[in-house]
C-alpha cells in the first residue's frame, strides 16, 4: 500500500485543533458508544421500521434483561444520541441524526459513508 499516495489525496481527519469543551463532549459520546450493547441498540433503533424502536421490542433481540436495556437506553438518551417519546405504557426511541453527524465528522467519514479517496 502506497501510504504517501493515500496521505496526499486524503484530507486530514481533524482540520482544526479541538478545544477542551469540544474534546470532552466528543470523548463522552464516544465513551457511550464504546459499549457493545449500546452500539447494538443504536443500530437496532436506526434500522427499525420508521427509524424508531419501542423499548419493548429491543429486549429480546439484545438478549439482556429489561432493566439493563432501559439503563442503556437512558445512557444513550442522556448523551443526546437518541430521543425518547412516551406513548401509553411504552417508550419509543429515535436516533438524533445531527448528533451522529457530529461524531461522523470528527472521524472524517464522508456523509454518504463512502471510504472517501482512500
Predicted regions and their residues:
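Amphipathic alpha-helical dimerization/coiled-coil segments
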Residues: 1-25, 46-48, 97-118
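N-terminal helix-turn-helix DNA-binding core of bacterial DNA-binding proteins
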Residues: 20, 24-65, 91-99
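A cross-family signal for key residues in well-ordered alpha-helices
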Residues: 31, 40-43, 77, 83, ...
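Base-recognition residues in the alpha-helical recognition helix of bacterial helix-turn-helix
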Residues: 43, 70-74, 89
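Alpha-helical residues within the helix-turn-helix
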Residues: 60, 71, 77-78
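Beta-hairpin "wing" of winged helix-turn-helix
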Residues: 78-87, 94
Amino acid at each position: 500500500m502506497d501510504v504517501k499516495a493515500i496521505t496526499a489525496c486524503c484530507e486530514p481527519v481533524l482540520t482544526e485543533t479541538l478545544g477542551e469543551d469540544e474534546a470532552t463532549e466528543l470523548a463522552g459520546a464516544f465513551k457511550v458508544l464504546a459499549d457493545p450493547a449500546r452500539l447494538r441498540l443504536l443500530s437496532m433503533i436506526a434500522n427499525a421500521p420508521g427509524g424508531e424502536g419501542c423499548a419493548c421490542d429491543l429486549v429480546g433481540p439484545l438478549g439482556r434483561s429489561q432493566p439493563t436495556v432501559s439503563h442503556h437506553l437512558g445512557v444513550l438518551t442522556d448523551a443526546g444520541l437518541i430521543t425518547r417519546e412516551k406513548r401509553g405504557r411504552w417508550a419509543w426511541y429515535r436516533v438524533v441524526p445531527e448528533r451522529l453527524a457530529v461524531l461522523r465528522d470528527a472521524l472524517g467519514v464522508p456523509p454518504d459513508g463512502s471510504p472517501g479517496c482512500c
